[in-house]
Amino acid sequence: MRKPLTPKAKRRLLGLGQDLLILVLVVSAVMLAGGSGLLDFAGDISGGVLGMQSGQNQGGQKEYTAAAEPLSMMLTPEAGAHCGVMYSQEELYSAYDRFSATLAEALGSSGEPEQISEEEWRAALNETGVFFDFYCDFQLSSLAIWLGTEINGPAAGHTARRICISLDNGLVWLSYVRSRDEGGFYRCSTSVQAGEFAARVGESIPNGAEFVFELSPTYDALDPYTVLMQGSIVLGSISGENSLRSADSEALYTAFGLSSYLASTYPESDGTLVSIEGEATLRLGADGELKYSFKPIEDESAPKLSPTDAIELARRLVENTAGRYCGEASLRLSYIYLSAETGEYTICFDYVYDGVPLRISGREHGVEKTESGERET
């Protein structure tokens, strides 16, 4: 049972109304390699793509922060007996903290991926193990990097939203669902120690949680791998308001590498405030919409963004703009897509409150960012 939000908490929850701050960006990989103040606001990433030297730590390694975390987990201490974790950010943090190192080891030691049947995937979900639902698909290589390791082999390029580490015949396996590309269910061998893993998962106490596919009868309208909790779920109420009313305009200029003194600023008839500096344009709409665009200088030799670097750049920019005005909520990666035709990434972030994703009326996503190797619009 959860307590409703206090009035103070409601007042702090900014940016979640229909007029909430929406960030629409189109940024060129060429610009990222050498041309804008956008590179300077966060630092740390480097190496040809995001600047020359500013982005490396003292050990010469790029630094990344996780853009996504599981919004539900299922711990299975013994076959068929589950402990679901949902609707509580504190409990999700605790559970993920307990098993993130195991997930990192499983990813880093994963062998050649083999395709399995859906029945085998479901069997893995019922064995002793841990299931993670990250809310959106992204490359396993990105997840590995966020966890401080790396994947060598074909699995690195596979995208997945749902991942399971399970025990089978004395071995620990990494299984996942590829809902994009060719699709299908896959598993890899790992070097995770079975005894230690089983003991850690065995500390979980079953709470009656189930996957939808385990119900009898099942519900065709629901995703079969949705985690269902037992008992009544009480969610606190939330309120929102236009974030731009409380936004520091100077901080927004700085985040986008603009100067309020150098930019030419004028209002439009609908109340939108437009600021132009060089090839950059920042539009602050009276309805709570913020748009930034930049036309870079073309450079054929500029390196292309990797998916992990594209997500990290987007995360940092979001953190320093819309992320400043989230109140009690947070922004988490919810979508990434790379167009093979245009070389353009579309990266979206959605608001999450206490482990629950939020949908804004009239908006598909909380924040949308597009990065390409071409010009931006």
Residue ranges and their predicted role:
Residues 2-10, 19-22, 26-310, 316-320:
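Preferential activation on post-signal-peptide N-terminal prodomains/segments
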